[in-house]
Amino acid sequence: MDYFLKNLKWLINALALEPKLLHTLLPPHSYIPNEMTDQYEMIVDEDLSDIAPVLTAEQIEHFKPLHNYINSLFVREDLIDCWYDNDFIYSSEWNVIHTMAKDFEQYMGWEISEPLKPLYSEIIYVDSEDE
């Protein structure tokens, strides 16, 4: 499976998970909203050029509402600190992301493979006090 398609599927499946399950995908003490949006920005380029080759034009059209919504949140100054607050995944804004991701997931026929594999396969602590 193509790198971008595989990672897009993981990302959509992750965003479609119930918020309490997002903690299982990332290392302890991670800023979940920030990590998820960093992944989003790496996989889905602003102009959709990275995923355009792996999705049909119709699939892109179904993806655009989610993409536009996420981008609208990125530019909101009142949310600038929310990306570093894990409570944000329980907000109404995140619920819209969750719902739209579930809708796109269903449209694509992607099943959530629970448990979804963690984002990182290994965590290396550089501070000996962390475990």
Spans of model-derived segments:
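Short terminal alpha-helical segments
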Residues: 1-47
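Proline-rich intrinsically disordered, low-complexity coils
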Residues: 19, 27-28, 33, 53, ...
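Amphipathic protein-protein interaction modules
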Residues: 49-109, 113
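Eukaryotic acidic, Ser/Thr-rich intrinsically disordered low-complexity regions
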Residues: 105, 116-126
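Eukaryote-specific, cytoplasm-facing alpha-helical/coiled-coil scaffolding segments in long proteins
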Residues: 37, 124-131
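Generic signature of intrinsically disordered, low-complexity, basic-rich segments
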Residues: 10-12, 97, 124
